[in-house]
Amino acid sequence: MPSGKLTSNGGRKERLIELMNELERWANFYLLMSAAAATLIGLLFVIITLGAERSVEDGTAKIRMYVTPTVVYFASVLFLAALLTFPNHTRLTASLCTCLVGVAGLVYSGSFLIGRGGKKNYYGVQDQIVYAVVPFAAYGLHVFGGVLFFHAPQRGLTLVAAGMLSLLALAIRNSWAIAVDVVSTPRGQQNSK
């Protein structure tokens, strides 16, 4: 009986070491993702602050519709990268962390797909794709990668990485659009209504 217990504990320890090695291979990627996301969130806040003196019609609504999702995408990348660098993950905890972030993102981006409860909608078809469809797919990669991670860690982490890169690229694109909008708004433009 004791030898069986040792084998069981030894097998668990080996699996934990294997998992730590799997996550360790991705450590630089997660560091890069979290640093990029944190830096770009800061730059986005600088852009918003510099553009605050430019009065824009329905400015608050536009911030909610355009800036908030972009910050959420950056924050998702930062948060997931931080979660996956925690030491002593098991396959279950790493998989759950990834899936929970993915499900939260699916709910958030899905709310754009269903129209945000009938609120005034600034989105055209291109904006619906950029703010709803692409993030929904990226968060779906997180969920699928988290499930796959439980069975095949490298493949699962590759899908999670693809989702993270998609969100980061999307948030950079959205940040650029916001920056161009802020710069193209004439200084001191007043609401016409």
Question: Residue spans of the language-model regions?
Answer:
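N-terminal amphipathic/basic-hydrophobic helices that include classical n-h-c signal peptides
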Residues: 1-18
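Helix-coil boundary and interhelical linker segments in multi-pass alpha-helical membrane proteins
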Residues: 15-33, 82-95, 146-160
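Juxtamembrane helix-loop boundaries in multi-pass membrane proteins
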Residues: 25-35, 55-79, 120-139, 180-193
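N-terminal signal-anchor/start-transfer transmembrane helix
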Residues: 35-52
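Core segments of alpha-helical transmembrane spans in multipass integral membrane proteins
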Residues: 39-43, 67-82, 98-110
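Juxtamembrane transmembrane-helix termini
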Residues: 48-58, 86, 90, 114-119, ...
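Membrane-proximal helix-loop-helix units in multi-pass membrane proteins
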Residues: 83-142
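Terminal transmembrane helical module of multi-pass membrane proteins
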Residues: 142-192
